[in-house]
Amino acid sequence: MNKRRKFLFASVLAVQNSNFIYPSCQRCFSKIILESKRFTCPKCGSSGDTGSTNYRYKLSLKVAESSKLFFITVFGSCLDTFFGLTATGLHRYLGDSIKNLETLDSGRTQSLLTTAVEKCFVGQSFVFGVTNFGDVCGHDSDSSNFQQPCCKHRGEVRTLVASQIILPSPHVKGFTVIAYLHPLLHKKPHCGSQEHSSQSLTSDDSDSDLNNIQGSGNTSWFSESSVGEDFFRYWEPSLELTSSDSQVTSSDDFPASKQIMASGTPNQNRHCISVSEVTSSKNCHDSLQSLWSLHSCMDKNNTTGKLGEELGLPSPVCNSCHESRLSDSHFFPSQMQEPFEEHNLECYSKAEKNDYSQYDIACYQHHEVNTTPILQQRSSAFSLSSLKPEETANPSQNSDSLIWDDLPLSESLNKFLAVVESEVAVTEIDAKNRKQGMDKSIDKCHKNYSRLSLTPWRNTRALNTSCFSLRSSQAMMKDSGKEALFSNCKSNSSPHIQKESKADKTEAAVSIAGSRSDISEDFLPDTCSSALFTSSKDREAFITQKRTSGVLQQRNEISCRPSTSISDCSDLRSRYFTGCGQKLHSGTKGKLAIQNCSKKYSDASDLHKLENKHRWPKKEDDNFTICRKLTYPLETLCSSPESINTSKEMPYRPSNNNLTPSSSGDHEGSYNASADLFDYIAKDKDIGTEITKIPQDNLLPLEVPCTENYPINENRGQPSQKPSLQSISPSRYSRPRSQSDSECDFEESQDFVPCSQSTPVAGFHQRIHGLNGASKILPSIYSNPNANYKNRKNSPLTGQYQATSACSKNVKAFRQKPESPFVSSLTQANVFNHCPAAESLGNDVDEWVPPTTKKVFISDILGFRVMGLRKCLDLHYSPDPKELPRKKLIKVTHKTNI
């Protein structure tokens, strides 16, 4: 007889039978009679050997749909997915277990099997394909009135037969019966027979059993079985419930699997209670335990409630004696929202709701929100269960079912998005607060700039700071420190920002304070400079950075420059002290320790002398006047006479044309001023010669002493470079960089050499001549600025340096008093590099400026005292009788056609 299948969506409440398999006929699926060696089918009469007996599943369940109860008996191989193996395989497995395990008998084995079946099915929701729905209710199966109650069986529990059981959603997962049964069979027996009853399904047993199932050592038992069947620990993903044409289902012989695959998938099959879905970040054991121990929950909770919108769970079941066809456009009737009256479903739904709302919402509140991973995690952990039938009837919602699958189990979309958006808003507020804090830290650093710029000086003499110096120092602070400070603030290095800003601001403060002509006696005290650095590591990092700008050199400079106006001199003076003031943060009188002098320069190979030659074109007769000047360092006086056989080569480097005040270690550039000051400069370790182009007719007497005594600095060295022998650009020249940590002595000449302003600048050649024809490159010597930082001894009142006995005979330190400045025809930024400081002045580069023929003394303008070179030498030191003879400036004339 052809019957149409009706589908019923219901939840399993209990297991009604204990015998889940029976021997069946392979033709009519009826129960056969087993004899000693053969079997016989009473319905069709077929027979066969007992060894070829086939078994079939039979499972009787008590289910609930809405407020109605049904007894449904499921037959066939559709249960293979949930048991994990076929019925024949299960029969063989039980027989082998009884033989292998002496403690097991048939009664205990059957009891344990019942327990495993209950754990697998109770509390789950399935779609049952019912075959006798119309016969039981007494209505025509073709009737469209599915909501009419059954008058004959009013108040009775109806019994239905199902040949199909389908998971409502492919996302629902669970353990199979065999996965529960195996740990129960191999579990050690306990005293008492109550464990073997069906009441043993408690939370403790469920916890221990599930832990045994999840153990890593429980997978080997499948291979040990002699059944040879394929076992599954988890439910296989079954095909979803699909709608098909009524003509397809008219034949009972048409397989159910083909009926499912006949048409598209409606979204009604997703209206299920995904009880085995992991609903939180808790382990799988906790989630499955709360779902599979439904009977215990039912006994403890006797309250009743509705399953409507409050719990977020659907009730897609029919009233009594109603059915739903596959061919109907509405898979479930409109009265599916009738709430369950069974308290077990209320208990389940409350447990699910509390599990999500208490744990997962707390996770949103305590962790940083990342919207995309959260949605992906929730979509994998939850299946759609709160969708209403009216919503599923909407075609637009059916077309995008995957979006609804991402929704949580017990949370509406609005609530879910509200939680996420609130956390995103909190994150944005935190970002704004961090940005404001960063801005405040930058403002604080700028305030530290201005505070450091007003650092008091040790000397009681008032320092008049010009507006020009103040403006230039402020511009210098903005240009040099703004970008570095902002980048460091973004990298969360506030302490480093403050340290760096302090170091830069110190230069600015010194630059402002050094705008007077008596800057040589107004230095930053040692205590102030030490306070700017919190540790020796900071001083080392700061001084090392400044050391890279150049190396220490000893040189004498002879330059002339005319003065045109007082305003030009003022501008020159402000520029001069702005550049020189950046070298003054280490001490007032400078601290010079010469203890390491004999260590680093005792070798005769380190003593050199330099001879540079430059040519200047003369306008009148095209003659070149070459001024040769030889200078001897202090080392020659402190070492053996054999050290004179080597020559020292000084590095000459090209540099930029602009002189701009800045707080960095390198100061490069040139400026066009009408007046300039030149001096003999006594530097620390090496000697450099500055060659000046002088017309032939203005050459001074050559009896200028060039040998001087120099104080030695222990913290600076000079890397050697071979000078270029090729012609250098006529518009630019380079000079060696200089760097000093303490005060140096000035000695100037009374003579000056005016030059013609209209004389064009021509190329010149540089030749290095060493004594006895030998030349050697001075090796690079670097020293740790912190190593001897504390060894420097300076008298705060006299400003004199304490030298070792190795050099004390020929070295005398005295106050820096420039004598006899003259007007120079060359605009050079490093003419004033004689200023003592702990930082290096910038690159020694300047652009040649056409000279002038005016001869002007600017001693009154700049406030310096004029003192002759010989007078200065007589006052400050007496030459050693063993001192090397001084060489004179040799006048050589060449004629050249320009």
Swiss-Prot record:
Gene3D superfamilies assigned to the protein according to its UniProt record, in alphabetical order: Nucleic acid-binding proteins (2.40.50.140)
Tissue expression from the record: Highly expressed in the testis, spleen and heart. Expressed at high levels in the primary spermatocytes and to a lesser extent in the round spermatids. Also found in the bone marrow, brain, lung, kidney and liver.
Keywords in alphabetical order: Apoptosis, Cell cycle, Cytoplasm, Growth arrest, Nucleus
InterPro entries, A to Z: DDIAS (IPR043522), NA-bd_OB-fold (IPR012340), Rep_factor-A_C (IPR013955)
Broad class of where this protein is predominantly found: cytoplasm
UniProt biased composition (Polar residues): 643-664, 710-725
Keyword ATP-binding included in the entry's annotation: no
Annotated segments matching region Disordered: 191-210, 643-670, 710-749
Compartments in which it is found: Cytoplasm; Nucleus
UniProt keyword Electron transport present: no
GO cellular component, one term: cytoplasm
Biased composition (Low complexity): 726-741
GO biological process: cellular response to cytokine stimulus; cellular response to gamma radiation; cellular response to hydroperoxide; cellular response to UV; DNA damage response; fibroblast apoptotic process; hemopoiesis; negative regulation of fibroblast apoptotic process
Lineage top rank: taxon: Eukaryota
Induction (free text): Strongly induced by a wide range of stress signals: nitric-oxide, gamma- and UV irradiation, hydrogen peroxide, adriamycin and cytokines and this induction is dependent on p53/TP53. Expression is low in resting cells and increases almost 50-fold as the cells progress through the S phase.
Function comment: May be an anti-apoptotic protein involved in DNA repair or cell survival.
Protein's name in the database: DNA damage-induced apoptosis suppressor protein
Record organism: Mus musculus (Mouse)
Gene: Ddias
